[in-house]
């Protein structure tokens, strides 16, 4: 049995990146070879050397919504903070509301000048709330004007430019957090990668807050992931199958791309097919990868499901050794931090 403690490490607080670097691609890149255990310190732009003509680089094109709203109860003036998690249907959303005790079923909330209103419809087991919005106009436009970017709890500084918490290829609205491994790519770097003969392929997974939810059980097998919506189009599936048939590698950018590809690979016995749905796949050591052959990812929180996923691919000992190396070399950690490439 693997315990949550097996994935713990001491991280000096000053290594938690609070702001993005001026140039996206100037972050550092720790390249780890899982077969030999070799590690190389590089810069992110050097990912170009790690990709081979004929490979597919698979990226998550989800876009982060300004999903944090500040509202009040019209009858009392009491303030509430609402974080949108998942659009369940129509104008109905799963949310987290603070303070939760003020948000009973039937509670009305208004935002801004009242052009956006909501009513609490249901209380969920884990403390979340289902709410239904009422408004005139286009919901996303109202959200853009009233909402704030929901930065992770470990980032204490305000973000000057909200676009820095979006990838340059973000297109599909729906995430409560950025797929941060993609934040390092610039449009120029993607053009260089394409010019090398690498196929750029996009899928969608809308990142929920399960990403930041700590593992609260000791035996990791008892942890349940939050479900997240994913989609792989016919066109993307066709590209990936062509790459596979020609002997190229499937290289994923980030844990969200990995979880989407492996959800599909698990569902279709190792084959890649167009698909969409909800996934709660939890990848831990012992899992046999069916699609992904190499990937880039940021440095994650101790004891997190993301460190467990990296350990499933590279092995727990090598993963923790790579993290120790990154700490000694003062790599920057978490959402705005540096990256690793594992092959």
UniProtKB/Swiss-Prot annotation:
Name of the top EC class for this enzyme: transferase
Assigned EC number: 2.4.99.17
GO terms, molecular function: S-adenosylmethionine:tRNA ribosyltransferase-isomerase activity
Gene Ontology biological process terms, A to Z: queuosine biosynthetic process; tRNA wobble guanine modification
Protein name according to UniProt: S-adenosylmethionine:tRNA ribosyltransferase-isomerase
UniProt family annotation: Belongs to the QueA family.
Pathway linked to the protein: tRNA modification; tRNA-queuosine biosynthesis
Assembly and binders: Monomer.
Source organism (scientific name): Enterococcus faecalis (strain ATCC 700802 / V583)
């Amino acid at each position: 049995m693997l315990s949550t403690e097996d994935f713990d490490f001491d991280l000096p607080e000053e290594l938690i990146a609070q702001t993005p670097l001026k140039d996206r691609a100037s972050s550092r890149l720790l390249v780890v070879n899982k077969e030999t255990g070799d590690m190389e310190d590089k810069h992110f732009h050097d990912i170009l050397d790690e990709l081979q003509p004929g490979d597919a680089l698979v990226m998550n094109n989800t876009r982060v919504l300004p999903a944090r709203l500040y509202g009040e109860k019209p009858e009392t003036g009491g303030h509430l903070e609402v974080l949108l998690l998942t659009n369940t249907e129509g104008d109905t959303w799963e949310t987290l509301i603070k303070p939760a005790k003020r948000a009973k079923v039937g509670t009305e909330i208004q935002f801004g000048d009242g052009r956006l209103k909501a009513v609490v419809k249901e209380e969920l087991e884990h403390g979340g709330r289902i709410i239904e919005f009422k408004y005139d106009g286009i919901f996303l436009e109202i959200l853009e004007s009233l909402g704030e970017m929901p930065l992770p709890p470990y980032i204490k500084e305000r973000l000057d430019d909200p676009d820095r918490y979006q990838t340059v290829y973000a297109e599909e609205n729906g995430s409560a957090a950025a797929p941060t491994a993609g934040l390092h790519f610039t449009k120029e770097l993607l053009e260089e990668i394409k010019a090398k003969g690498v196929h750029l392929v996009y899928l969608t997974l809308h990142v929920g807050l399960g990403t930041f939810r700590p593992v609260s059980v000791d035996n990791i097998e008892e942890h349940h992931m939050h479900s997240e919506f994913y989609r792989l189009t016919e066109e993307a599936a066709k590209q990936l199958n062509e790459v596979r048939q020609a002997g190229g590698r499937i290289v994923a950018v980030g844990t969200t791309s990995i979880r989407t590809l492996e959800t599909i690979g698990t569902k279709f016995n190792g084959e890649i097919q167009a698909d969409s749905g909800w996934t709660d796949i939890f990848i831990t050591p012992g899992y046999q990868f069916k699609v992904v052959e190499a990937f880039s990812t940021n440095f994650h929180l101790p004891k997190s499901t993301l460190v467990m996923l990296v350990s499933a691919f590279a092995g727990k000992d090598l993963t923790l050794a790579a993290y120790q190396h990154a700490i000694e070399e003062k790599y920057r950690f978490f959402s705005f931090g540096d990256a690793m490439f594992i092959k």
